[in-house]
Amino acid sequence: MKKIKVKAYAKINLSLDVLGKREDGYHEISTIMQSIDLADILEFEKSEIVKVFCNDHRVPLGEDNLIVKVINLLKEKYQMEEGVLVKLDKRIPLAAGLAGGSADAAATIVALDKLWNLNMSKEEKKEIALKVGADVPFCLEGGTKLAKGIGEIFEDLKITSMNLLLVKPDIEISTKEIYDKWDRLNFKSHHATVPVVQAIQEGNIYKIAENIKNDLELVTSQKYGIINKIKEELLKKGALGCAMSGSGPTVYGIFDDLEKLRKAYEDLKEVYSFVFFSKTIDKGLELYE
């Protein structure tokens, strides 16, 4: 096998409770992570050198890039001499709260396992994933998961398919900055995860939409009023409920009426540079060989 293509799917958070800061600097959370059908496309090809190409010039391709981090970790762990050429077709917006970088890292773990014949176990993949970032273990599996710890302890959930509209304003958010501000201002959690889990188990889209909340929204919307403006617009246009994903700034709305969703899409794409009509899916990655 010389070449592998992977679709790396984005995620949203249907809830995000921040429960405290750990000694290692990470935050203890309780969150429901959900894969959606927005995806980056990555192509991996055997080579003597390591080189990453991307269609978006804003993506940094140095040692801090998560794809590069995974390549270096795997080369070191398995004493690999050969390299890889990676072509990244970036479709998930940057610094958006949608785990685009984490999805690309997960795709790299799975692709190189096959391309380099590493025969990694599920645990070995997860171990590498955790070294790279807190969302990467989820992106390896995808679907709908209740995640605890720093986001690496999972419980599978089964969700009714939902139609979504994603809107990202023209701002980029630093996750670290948002968590630091959360700590400084001593915010208290909404504890939204339990009611959303119950609604998912009941298969009740209306209850899910009614209960979605994200603690980090308190911080991000305080600095960027546009978050609340987008939420108001989505609700006015027929969303059953809406929330920010991750540390933001992407906001999503859940719709049960496709006509209203299409109309909202047409209206909002005139105002915002990134508006995406999406749906929930049950996987994090898709491989093409």
UniProtKB/Swiss-Prot annotation:
<keyword id="KW-0418">Kinase</keyword>
<keyword id="KW-0067">ATP-binding</keyword>
<dbReference type="GO" id="GO:0016114">
    <property type="term" value="P:terpenoid biosynthetic process"/>
</dbReference>
<dbReference type="InterPro" id="IPR020568">
    <property type="entry name" value="Ribosomal_Su5_D2-typ_SF"/>
</dbReference>
<dbReference type="InterPro" id="IPR036554">
    <property type="entry name" value="GHMP_kinase_C_sf"/>
</dbReference>
<feature type="active site">
    <location>
        <position position="11"/>
    </location>
</feature>
<dbReference type="InterPro" id="IPR014721">
    <property type="entry name" value="Ribsml_uS5_D2-typ_fold_subgr"/>
</dbReference>
<dbReference type="InterPro" id="IPR006204">
    <property type="entry name" value="GHMP_kinase_N_dom"/>
</dbReference>
<feature type="active site">
    <location>
        <position position="135"/>
    </location>
</feature>
<keyword id="KW-0547">Nucleotide-binding</keyword>
<dbReference type="GO" id="GO:0019288">
    <property type="term" value="P:isopentenyl diphosphate biosynthetic process, methylerythritol 4-phosphate pathway"/>
</dbReference>
<dbReference type="InterPro" id="IPR004424">
    <property type="entry name" value="IspE"/>
</dbReference>
<keyword id="KW-0414">Isoprene biosynthesis</keyword>
<dbReference type="Pfam" id="PF00288">
    <property type="entry name" value="GHMP_kinases_N"/>
</dbReference>
<comment type="function">
    <text>Catalyzes the phosphorylation of the position 2 hydroxy group of 4-diphosphocytidyl-2C-methyl-D-erythritol.</text>
</comment>
<feature type="binding site">
    <location>
        <begin position="93"/>
        <end position="103"/>
    </location>
    <ligand>
        <name>ATP</name>
    </ligand>
</feature>
<dbReference type="GO" id="GO:0005524">
    <property type="term" value="F:ATP binding"/>
</dbReference>
<dbReference type="GO" id="GO:0050515">
    <property type="term" value="F:4-(cytidine 5'-diphospho)-2-C-methyl-D-erythritol kinase activity"/>
</dbReference>
<keyword id="KW-0808">Transferase</keyword>
<comment type="pathway">
    <text>Isoprenoid biosynthesis; isopentenyl diphosphate biosynthesis via DXP pathway; isopentenyl diphosphate from 1-deoxy-D-xylulose 5-phosphate: step 3/6.</text>
</comment>
<dbReference type="Pfam" id="PF08544">
    <property type="entry name" value="GHMP_kinases_C"/>
</dbReference>
<protein>
    <recommendedName>
        <fullName>4-diphosphocytidyl-2-C-methyl-D-erythritol kinase</fullName>
        <ecNumber>2.7.1.148</ecNumber>
    </recommendedName>
</protein>
<dbReference type="InterPro" id="IPR013750">
    <property type="entry name" value="GHMP_kinase_C_dom"/>
</dbReference>
<comment type="similarity">
    <text>Belongs to the GHMP kinase family. IspE subfamily.</text>
</comment>
